[in-house]
């Protein structure tokens, strides 16, 4: 939503302002199996899973791997980016 869009804009602006000394990137996770979704109703969870092209909830380890990539030298030419890890849910019409 709005907060993710604000973070994405901030990342782009900061990356341009402080490069090449520091790389700035972010991760935008989708529905992830955490304590936070335990309070979600079963119906809402089912609907969100159904609206996700990969038809499942993500695992915290999957987000950790995305972050690990951004911290590694493998992403040394990546800056100003937001890696969306949401099972294909965003953007959907």
Label for each model-derived stretch:
Residues 3, 11:
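Active-site helix of classical SDR
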Residues 12-20, 76:
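Alpha-helical segment proximal to the catalytic Tyr-Lys
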Residues 25-39:
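Short, flexible catalytic-loop segment of classical short-chain dehydrogenase/reductase
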Residues 38-52:
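A short C-terminal helix-loop "cap" of Rossmann-like NAD(P)-dependent dehydrogenase/epimerase domains
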Residues 52-63:
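A conserved structural motif in NAD(P)-dependent oxidoreductases
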Residues 64-76:
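Alpha-helical substrate-binding/gating segment
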Residues 68, 79-93:
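Short C-terminal tail/terminal secondary-structure segment
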């Amino acid at each position: 939503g709005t907060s993710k869009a604000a973070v994405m804009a901030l990342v782009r602006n900061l990356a341009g302002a402080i490069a090449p000394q520091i790389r700035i990137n972010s991760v935008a996770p989708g529905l992830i199996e955490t304590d936070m979704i335990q309070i979600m109703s079963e119906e809402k969870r089912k609907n969100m899973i159904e609206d996700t092209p990969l038809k499942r909830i993500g695992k915290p380890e999957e987000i950790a791997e995305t972050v690990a990539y951004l911290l590694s030298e493998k992403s040394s030419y990546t800056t100003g980016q937001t890696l969306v890890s949401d099972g294909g849910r965003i953007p959907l019409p």
